[in-house]
A protein has these predicted regions:
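Signal-transducing coiled-coil linker helices
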Residues: 1-35, 42-53, 57
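Nucleotide second-messenger and two-component phosphorelay signaling modules
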Residues: 31, 50-59, 63, 74, ...
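Heptad-repeat coiled-coil signal-transmission/dimerization helices
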Residues: 45, 49, 84, 88-91, ...
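A short glycine-centered flexible hinge/capping loop motif at secondary-structure junctions
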Residues: 72-80, 105-106
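Short, conserved catalytic or interaction motifs in soluble domains
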Residues: 73, 114, 176
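GGDEF/GGEEF active-site signature
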Residues: 88-152
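Catalytic/regulatory signature loops of cyclic-dinucleotide turnover enzymes
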Residues: 138, 162-203
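Conserved nucleotide-binding and Mg2+-coordinating catalytic segments in signaling enzymes
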Residues: 29-47, 63-76, 85
Length: 204
């Protein structure tokens, strides 16, 4: 077999494997993304969030759409999907490229961001107002999003699951008070003494 032919065969095999590798990479990437919102899935979010938590300035925030079932029942699932997609986009924009946002399931989202300036409280207050704006694709939908957050530095011994539990307790308290934003306390969470709410699970 001539040398030019061998070269052509080698190039062809390399191209086939290159295309196959690209295709597999795209398949894996899509499997890690939530199909509705484009955010990371729970598993993909967990891996990235754990890396960010090595930074003592990390902040964990949990977001939950208020009255989501009522939105679905009143306006239909298309409006509910539009609300979730818009909420996800607004969260991702607020967190930026240096953080990570994921959809944990249903109408619940989580994010980890780095807050070196100590402005998380102000940022989340603004974010809550942004999340309460009407949805362009479904302007008849009006609701709010409750946020609970916790600083990594306040609980250095906690892993991601523990921090999510604290953020969840704060978020549940936010649903019952004004402003729709609560920071997890430094001690035992009064709003959630028994841990996460029934049916809620922390990241593995």
């Amino acid at each position: 077999m001539s040398t030019p032919l061998l070269v052509l065969i080698a190039v062809g095999v390399a191209l086939v494997w290159g295309v196959h590798g690209w295709w597999m990479s795209r398949r894996l990437q899509s499997a890690r993304r939530d199909p509705l919102t484009g955010l990371w899935t729970r598993e993909a979010f967990t891996r990235r969030a754990r890396r960010l938590l090595r930074n003592p300035h990390a902040v964990v925030v949990l977001a939950d759409v208020d009255r989501f079932k009522q939105v679905n029942d009143t306006h239909g699932h298309a409006a509910g999907d539009a609300l979730l997609a818009t909420t996800a986009a607004r969260l991702a924009h607020a967190v930026g490229r240096t953080g990570v946002v994921g959809r944990l399931g249903g109408d619940e989202f989580a994010a980890v961001l780095i807050d070196r300036e100590g402005t998380a409280a102000d940022r989340f207050a603004v974010l809550a107002r942004i999340l309460a704006r009407p949805v362009d694709a479904a302007p008849e939908v009006h609701t709010t999003v409750s946020l609970g957050w916790v600083r990594r530095g306040d609980h250095p011994a906690e892993d991601l699951s523990g921090l999510l539990r604290r953020a969840d307790g704060a978020m549940y308290a936010a649903k019952r008070g004004p402003g729709r934003v609560r920071r997890a306390g430094l001690g035992r969470l009064l709003a959630n003494i028994g841990g996460r709410r029934p049916g809620r699970r922390g990241a593995a």
